[in-house]
Regions:
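His/Met- and acidic-residue-enriched segments that coordinate or traffic transition-metal cofactors
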Residues: 2-11, 16-180
Length: 180
């Protein structure tokens, strides 16, 4: 049953992101030439890509090291949703001549490394706190891009991802340690 739900969630996330990409590409208007992409859009692509990579790595840790079902299920959801988001973002960034980060930031790597050494209830509490902070940061980043991004497709992508990120944040608050 859980595998069926996970597969359905992964499929839905992939279809949604692919659909958003198709809609943005079909009606998003003219793209900016890669040499004219503002620094803010470049930073968004880089930061969003790194954040997605971090969420996938953290989600995998939650699945393997989490004690509670809530943490493990949330981890599975993070892997599915953030993998799909990175695919969609890469599909938008490529034609703009922008490359996604290939790994999490140094700070994100340090957080991942600290969680690798934890297990059980301690892992769950720490992971819950990290999930809340990371999704608060992601909501701010995507809100900024949705409101002020120069590239129309990146703006659309950010706006369409915001409800999912806000849902993740709400879910993270219900995890052990997520109430901070």
């Amino acid at each position: 049953m859980k595998k069926s739900i996970l597969l359905a969630t992964c499929f839905l996330a992939a279809v949604t992101c692919t659909s958003l990409y198709a809609q943005a590409s079909a009606g998003g208007g003219p793209h900016l030439a890669s040499d004219t992409i503002p620094q803010a859009d470049r930073m968004f692509v880089s930061q969003a890509g790194a954040a997605n990579m971090a969420e996938v790595a953290l989600g995998n840790l939650a699945v393997s090291q989490g004690q509670s079902d809530a943490v493990r299920n949330f981890g599975n959801r993070m892997v599915a949703d953030h993998t799909a988001a990175n695919v969609a973002l890469n599909n938008l960034a490529g034609p703009l001549g922008l490359a996604l980060a290939q790994q999490p930031t140094l700070q994100q790597e340090q957080t991942i490394d600290s969680l690798k050494n934890m297990s059980g209830a301690s892992f769950d509490r720490h992971y819950g706190r990290v999930a809340v902070k990371d999704h608060e940061d992601a909501v701010r980043l995507f809100t900024q891009e949705a409101s002020f991004g120069a590239d129309p497709d990146l703006r659309t992508f950010a706006a369409h991802m915001l409800p999912t990120l806000k849902q993740h944040l709400s879910m993270a608050h219900s995890l052990p340690g997520g109430g901070l």
